[in-house]
Amino acid sequence: MKWGRTPAPVSSAVDSGERILAWSTLRGRPEGTYVIATDAALYVVDTNPLRLPWDCVTKATWTDDAILVVEARPNRQAPDQVWHLSPEDLQRLPTVVYERVTSNVVVSEKVALEGDLGIRIVARRSGDDMRWTVTFDPGLNAEDPDLRRRAEEALADLRSTLGL
């Protein structure tokens, strides 16, 4: 994030009405590629532009060598996808990304299904609604009908308990 005027390619890449909070060019990418954090979404602007609303981002972490690893579920039925981004400027981006991802989480609950293995149920604000995601631990077969049934029951129980 540079101080001063936001470059036109950055401003024009975001949806109308969104406020740009932080941005950076990306290391090792052609000129004109950016990562942009707005009040509503994370953008990756390159040859194949991407907009990830914050309620779709399931996890965002930083590696020791300043690579932003974003896990997101852009489609409610799809599994998480992972993007590795190398911003050149880290002044505000790490703080903004952390704040935006965590501020959308309303509830996060771990439910055991088999021993220590289970699911993580997360509700995130999505406009006026809630976006619920259920993520199976590695080692559990998410296609197993019995496990899916138990996961759906756990989700229904949690929603009922919370009145959501």
Spans of model-derived segments:
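Eukaryotic intrinsically disordered, low-complexity regulatory linkers and tails enriched in Ser/Thr/Pro
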Residues: M1-L164
